[in-house]
Amino acid sequence: MSVSYFQERGTPASGDVLSPATTSLGGASRGANALSSRITSVLSASYADLEIRDALETLDTRGVRNTAETRRQIRLDVQKEVIECNGEIVKDFGQVAEQLKRIGTAISSLNSYCADMRSHIAAANKETGPVLEEATGLINQRKQVESKQQILQAFNSHFLISDEEATVLTSTAEPVNEEFFQVLTRVKKIHHDCQVLLGTEDQRLGLEILEQSSKQLNAAFQKLYRWIQREFKTLDLENPQISASVRRSLRVLAERPTLFQSCLDSFAEARESILSDSFHSALTGSASDAEHIATKPIEFQAHDPLRYVGDMLAWVHSTTVSEREALENLFISDGDEIKRSIQEGLESEPWLKDEEAEIFDGRKALSQLVGRDLASVARVLRQRTEQVVQSHDDATLAYKIANLIGFYKGMFAKLLGTDSDVLEVFTTLEASAMRQFRANMRDYVAAVQSDIAVPPQDLSPPDFLDDALQTLKVLAKSYDTSSAGAEDQEQGFQAVLAEALDPFMSGCVNLQKGLQQPDSAVFAINCLFAAKDVLSAFTFASERVEEMEDTISEQVAQLVDYQHEYLLHESGLATLLEALEPITDDEESLKTIPELEPFKRDALVAASQQLDEFLPSALIDAAENLKRLKNRKMIQDITEEAAASFCEDFEVVESKIIAADDLTYDEDKEDEEQEPGLRDLFPRTSGEIRVLLS
């Protein structure tokens, strides 16, 4: 529609330009240029221009048709509409102006009212200002007073205790109960918190409260100390349900190491007396209570020294275990509380602290306390045990008692530690029993040595050695029982061997010196085998057994040499070997063999006959030399070894004879013409010898 619009408008325009009724040429030219510019401007406008698009859309909504009338009136219609719209706007603004006038009037009225109110308020402020200032001051003062009152109440509740609480804390008429410990804990906190007050400029208040709390604490600990003392007098350690208040009291009292130690001292004295009486009752059966009626007194076993000492040691050990368990329940059931309390006490009483002292060890202190409780019992045990040991001259009994004491000593070391005074008593008793054992053994050895004359005819171990070995066997069994599991078990038995075996073996050596071979070696081996048989049953004597085996081997070697020499001399082979010693393997030396005296015809024939006569019974005759040796297999082994050496010597003689015959044999002569050779005179071969001696 817009295209047709521009075309229809262009037609009359063109007509107007060509019309003769137009104005002058200049005016027509300007009009044509203006129209041309207008048309050009319109045609150059883009249809995408928003203004043109809006204008076209407005025309479309009005339903305008493209007619000549419409084109003439459209401008006027638009201007008319604009004027009408402007009129309506002016009318509306007139109403707004009227309303603004009314609002202005209202505002003026309000301003007037506000001015009046300001004047009234200013007058009221002027009249009430001093009253408000005074009220504000009073309110601030009230807040300060309330704040001070709260501070005072907080201070009193924190740093002061009531008279009732002070009575509970310090009065001996009041019981030691949960309330006492609560008040005590509070006073300790007050005492500790006084450090804050001492840090202020005015320390007077802090010093006064510190002094007051110190007095209250001292009085409380004194009350607690006396209460514990009373409780200890009636305390039954055998009762597993020990009062929890006693344990708690001890833990708290530990904060005062001096009082705590004093309490322990009195407790130890009381327990020492009680345990001493109990031990005396167990020994004599003098107890009046029903607990010991069914138990026989230990002294009923006095006729059996070992059982008597064992029963006493068993009673002491059982009592020690019970005492330690009871004291653990009393002092250590709460863990390390007592240790921490003592450390706190030492910090609060630094003058009691030794710089070189070890850190408090609860277990060690407990062991020391148990040791103190058993001091009197240990003294009685020592007296009675020493009396038993010294009143018997039986070395075996003394050693068994020493081993028994050593066994219990190890158990007490685990219970009380190696530094316990009770352990020193056991060490002394063990040493005393061992001294008695050594003294008894030396007396016995001296008595035996005075009776020693000659060894038995059958070269068997002498009676004193048999008796000593029986005693040694008993001692070894006792040692094995008492020292089971000990690391130095073998080393510890050396002292027993030195006293119970070595002197008797030395006596056997002295007897051996008066014997000739083979009796000397046979006697030594018999004695060594007897001792070895006893010691082999005990692993802790393995070193001594090895030494004996080495000595037996040396003696066996001597017997082998003796048997070897016997075979050589009895067979006549010794003479031949002696003659062949200077002969070497060169031909000249070998040729001289027939000229040697033992190898001459008659002598060699005699030697051959002697050998033939010896061989059938050689082994029997040789074994007869060792018939008193107790080990039959050893007799056979020694003889066979000597026979083997004899065969080797015979092979030497045989080889020399054969070599000499080979050098003297004349191949040019007939066999009948040859002189008899050495081999012919001495026909035995090494093979035959080995068969006959096997």
From Swiss-Prot:
Q: Which biological process, per GO, is one annotated for this protein?
A: intra-Golgi vesicle-mediated transport
UniProt keyword annotation of Protein transport present: yes
Q: Which UniProt keywords apply?
A: Golgi apparatus, Membrane, Protein transport, Transport
InterPro entries assigned: COG6, COG6_C, COG6_N
**Membrane topology type, per the record?**
Peripheral membrane protein
Q: Which GO terms describe its cellular component?
A: Golgi membrane; Golgi transport complex
An example of a Pfam family matching this protein is COG6_N
Stretches for region Disordered: 1-20
Question: Where is the protein found, in the record's own terms?
Answer: Golgi apparatus membrane
Top-rank taxon of the source lineage equals: Eukaryota
- Keyword flag Transport: yes
Described function: Acts as a component of the peripheral membrane COG complex that is involved in intra-Golgi protein trafficking. COG is located at the cis-Golgi, and regulates tethering of retrograde intra-Golgi vesicles and possibly a number of other membrane trafficking events.
Q: Which family does it belong to?
A: Belongs to the COG6 family.
The identity of this protein, by name, is Conserved oligomeric Golgi complex subunit 6
| Species of origin | Phaeosphaeria nodorum (strain SN15 / ATCC MYA-4574 / FGSC 10173)
